[in-house]
Amino acid sequence: MSRPSVFITGANGFIGRSLGAHFAENGYDVRGVDLAADPARNVVAGDVVNPRPWKSHLQGCAVVLHTAAVVSNAVAAGQQWQANVLGTRRVLEAAARAGVERVVHFSSVRAYGDLGFPDGVKETWPLRADGRAYVDTKVAAEATAFAAHASGEIAVTVVRPGDVYGPGSRPWTIIPVEEIKKGRLILPAGGQGVFSPVYIDDLIAGILLAATHPDAAGQDFNLPGVEPVTCKTFFGHYTRMLNKPPPRTVPTRVAIALATAAGTVERFRGRSSELNAETVYYLTRAGGYSRAKAERVLGWVPQVSLDEGMARTEAWLRTEGYLD
């Protein structure tokens, strides 16, 4: 009896690689695409905007996990639209033509906008484009995905992960540690902005359910972690690991000025930088995200507390030399 097959876009990324490992452990034949090939993991080279190099690998797949996206505040808006919106449409088209049963589209809690949503926001709350390229493209990509579902083209499930951390996470593990070591981590809003950490293993468990549960088609799910915390609490775990003082905090306006200046210097030196006003605003959120729908429909309940997740993350960081 043949194994069920799954295809992952962005298969070499943090989440894509973790998904591949977990689906393989659950008996799936795993295939994927990313900008660089990895034959050992059945990953072919390609760009989601151009399906020609990879569309044949969709044949026989039950599910496509569409994780590929530009996840950066430092990339031009046009490039983000190409990858995040047009790329999503191309994946939907290719999957439908190959007879794939379902596409799981990876969005983000940022589709609610970075500010102005209620604490414990539910999936019924409207999404909000706010002029920031990453947010706007996530909103547009969701609309593109649900349009395909509504038209009967292909079944779609949308997931909105919280702030994913753990071994291999660049935005919420590796980069913060590097910034702390350089003495450059400064938190806005006095460190009281709300952070919604979800440990990578908990997220993967939720994705397995979203990809296979019969009631998940046509639905969207927030996938935050056990509980929201302040930014000062979250990033304080990393300063502790490095034997540094707790994160420095300043008023938001000061943080914006500092980040803008530092980011300008980095770009002048020819380096990409996430230091900008957009990153600062994200760390001033006033609320978290409800996971009640994922619990009710999928039976998903995150299991890894922040303390436990950070203990696992610290062990990985030490092994990889990031804490030296």
At which residue positions do the language-model features occur?
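Mid/C-terminal beta-alpha module of Rossmann-like enzyme folds, strongest
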Residues: L209-E274, D307, A311-E314, D324
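NAD(P)-dependent short-chain dehydrogenase/reductase
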Residues: H149-F195, I200-D202, Y238
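NAD(P)H-binding glycine-rich loop region in Rossmannoid oxidoreductase-like domains
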Residues: G46-L86, A94, Y112-D114
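Active-site Tyr-X1-5-Lys
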Residues: G131-T157
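Glycine/proline-rich active-site loop of Rossmann-fold NAD(P)-dependent oxidoreductases
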Residues: V139, G152-I154, Y165-I175, D201, ...
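Conserved Rossmann-fold NAD(P)-dependent oxidoreductase catalytic core, especially the SDR/UDP-sugar
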Residues: R90-A133
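N-terminal Rossmann NAD(P)H-binding glycine-rich loop of SDR-like oxidoreductase domains
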Residues: V6-N26
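Amphipathic terminal alpha-helices
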Residues: S5, Y289-R296, V301, S305-D324
